[in-house]
């Protein structure tokens, strides 16, 4: 069984805003340190950023407006904790403790992701979908159930009726849709809104890529400050993750569909 949400789901909107701010930080420095938390809904977007670079309120507001529309932006920026900053002075080290399990993507997960993308291309609005064997559940906002039934005659469609969705009727928060992003993979922390020094980003990506390459689960553990994980230099893990993010198109882009894209 698998659940997939599209980029217009409020939680993914929060992830995308967080990713956009990380992209901004990387435009200012090659290796910034940044962690972004976003809570959005009902006309307001709260953002707290711990960062080594300064993001102007205008830059932040522009990113929110582009992704989520005209909202009141409540932005709080603080400097990165000095102990965490010191951890990176003499090289790239794991920015936190963590457990990570990369798992190969299943045919079911690929199939549902294809369906989700097809619906998003058509409606470009909030949607959440489940596939469990032969059972397909489609919750698609701003769509007529009858039209969806023509394409998916055997699906359970909008069980409570047609709906509008989005941040006007629901709230969203960063890293709340990791099942959609990662499938059967496991993480102790969130994937989005963080720079590449954060193990939650780089080791998750590395483990997931290795699982796809080998066809078997990959389990890794790290402690904050480690310069190697399972005998692999952490710098190499970070560069592998950087190449993946660059290939996708940046942190905001990677937040749209997660690792299963």
Question: What are the residue ranges of the model-derived segments?
Answer:
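A domain-level signal for the structural core that forms small-molecule/cofactor-binding pockets
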Residues: 1-261
């Amino acid at each position: 069984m698998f659940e997939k949400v599209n980029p217009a789901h409020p939680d993914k909107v929060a992830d995308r805003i967080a990713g956009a701010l990380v992209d901004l930080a990387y435009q200012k420095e090659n290796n910034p340190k940044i962690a972004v938390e976003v809570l959005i809904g009902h006309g307001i977007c709260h953002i707290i950023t711990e960062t080594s670079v300064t993001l102007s309120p205008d830059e932040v507001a522009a990113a929110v407006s582009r992704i989520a529309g005209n909202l009141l932006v409540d932005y709080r920026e603080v400097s990165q904790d000095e102990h965490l900053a010191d951890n990176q002075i003499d090289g790239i080290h794991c920015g936190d403790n963590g457990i990570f399990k990369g798992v190969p993507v299943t045919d079911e997960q690929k199939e549902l992701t294809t369906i989700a993308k097809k619906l998003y291309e058509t409606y470009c609005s909030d949607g959440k979908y489940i596939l469990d064997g032969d059972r397909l559940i489609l919750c698609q906002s701003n769509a007529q159930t009858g039209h969806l039934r023509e394409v998916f005659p055997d699906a359970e469609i909008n069980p409570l009726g047609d709906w509008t969705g989005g941040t006007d009727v629901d709230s969203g928060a960063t890293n709340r849709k990791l099942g959609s992003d990662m499938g059967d993979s496991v993480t102790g922390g969130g994937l989005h809104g963080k720079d590449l020094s954060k193990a939650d980003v780089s080791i998750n990506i590395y483990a997931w890529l290795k699982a796809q390459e080998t066809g078997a689960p990959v389990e890794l553990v790290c402690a904050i400050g480690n310069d190697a994980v399972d005998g692999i230099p952490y710098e190499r893990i970070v560069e592998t993750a950087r190449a993946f993010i660059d290939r996708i198109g940046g942190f905001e882009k990677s937040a749209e569909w997660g690792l299963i894209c």
